[in-house]
């Protein structure tokens, strides 16, 4: 079980199947929580960047998939696939906004850079 210090988030946890755990139904994993936090943070960063370029990216759908697996040096590592979709913004413009949010604004992107493989998939209009 885990909970935020202020009680705003509570979750029953299980160990992911990839790590030899049961992956129990009705529970979550630390990877799920990381994915939710990263997606939420990235959404805020994208909205911030959009506003600075007079674009409304507040309705972008952001899906983050975090996987876990063995590392070459031992132990386990994470990999992230971030899917960003907003058909109201042209593809090239959305790609530029996502790139700026990822490279300059998002704290999760800063924290993972050089440590976690992050792949961005962008679908604009």
Region locations from a protein language model:
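Extended beta-strand/beta-hairpin segments
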Residues: 1-36, 43-125
